[in-house]
């Protein structure tokens, strides 16, 4: 036998086997490559979907609202302030609503009227699930509250009792409000306290009379009736309300405070700012201690709800 022929035969056989082995693994390699391409495609598409979802949204989105609460009787015999905050679980879908009502101490049943206002607002918000624009929701709740208070009093008792109402609603990074009376709604931003709503007291009417020359300008500041309310829950037909033309766009770090006059009449603006600067968890105690330190013998009921906007 020719050894050269045997060698060539073996080499030929090995080469044929190697080629067969390579062909066997080729489909597996192709499948793996296609799967890798599919994975890359899915990752790229997912990234595009996330970018499209976030397109047009601000980088600092308000995702959490923390709430602080202050409620004290002061030197009064009764607590006639009422307040409430909606269920935080409703924030993502419906928004968050807060309300403060200050029963009028000079009239009877102020506590019952303020309680009626708060209960109607919160029950109505829960029932409606906050459907509609901010303005529509707030006006509807105000309408229901006026109706319930008037029904409670009856036509013969209009103006015999009353309460203020200040409510605000946050949804999707925006804030709007409706107020009746002299409870205040303020924004604390960048170390400054900005009053958002207008008070409905006799001072406004006196100022109008003064600029029309009907009374001396000095009477705007000296008339003892100047703090009396000219629009309030319980008067029957409401004369005035306050609401913004457009909702306020909120920023991370903003704080909103809704408070009765027992807070802002007792404290200087700088004292309120100093308390809010401590943060929403510490602010209520800081405000209360500042009020107690004044030791006013006629200290009114004091109530505040603080809403802190966070990412």
Regions found by a protein language model. Give the residues of each.
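PP2C/PPM-type serine/threonine phosphatase catalytic domain
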Residues: 2-311
